[in-house]
Design a protein with these regions (language model features):
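Terminal low-complexity/charged segments
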Residues: 1-189
Length: 189
């Protein structure tokens, strides 16, 4: 049986060279998976890189499609941090897409809702106003906070909810929420 050929990553995305030249003194990395290129930036550089990707005419990423939170707890491969925030950017003029990822490591235990100073990134709502609700969802589900967000509060769960349930250390069956809070069925509504 012949060994399967592993595809070699194609890191020839035209945006990578432009960004690396513009941010020559910054630590930038790039990965490619199944034809999708991801630019990895440090949290402190995120906002500047995102503004550049939007405003530089050679990049012109005019549309933020999504903001995603990821918890890499117990991930089989080594990662640069426990949590990641991933931005899906599109350029309609150039019919191009790139993902931008930044990693965060918690500085306190993650089993509650305590505010962790290490789980902060700058909001991009000033660049793409549509990021407002997706950033709120990442905050609600993962506890990652966005500096300068115009309305950072929970979007799916109530304010007093005692956890961020998409964290991998959150129990699958919850922490007694079904017993503590009344569930409204269709017949009750």
């Amino acid at each position: 049986m012949a060994a399967a050929n592993k595809p070699t990553p194609n890191l020839d995305h035209p945006t990578l060279k432009i960004v690396k030249e513009a941010f020559a003194g910054k630590r930038l990395r790039a990965t490619e998976y199944r034809g999708q290129t991801t630019l990895i930036v440090e949290p402190a550089d995120l906002h500047a890189v995102m503004a550049f990707l939007r405003d530089d005419p050679r990049c012109d990423y005019d549309f933020l499609s999504d903001v995603i939170g990821v918890d890499y707890l117990d991930y089989p491969a080594e990662t640069l941090g426990r949590f990641a925030v991933i931005y899906n950017l599109c350029s309609y003029k150039r019919t191009d897409r790139i993902f931008v990822k930044t990693f965060l490591n918690p500085s306190i235990p993650t089993d509650g809702i305590e505010e962790d100073p290490a789980l902060y990134v700058d909001s991009v709502t000033d660049l793409w106003p549509g990021a407002e609700w997706t950033e709120r969802e990442v905050f609600d589900m993962f506890g990652i906070r966005f500096r300068n967000h115009p309305d950072l509060r929970r979007i799916l769960l109530w304010e007093a909810y005692p956890a961020h349930p998409l964290r991998k250390d959150y129990p699958l069956r919850g922490r007694g929420e079904r017993e503590q809070y009344r569930v409204i069925s269709r017949t009750d509504a």
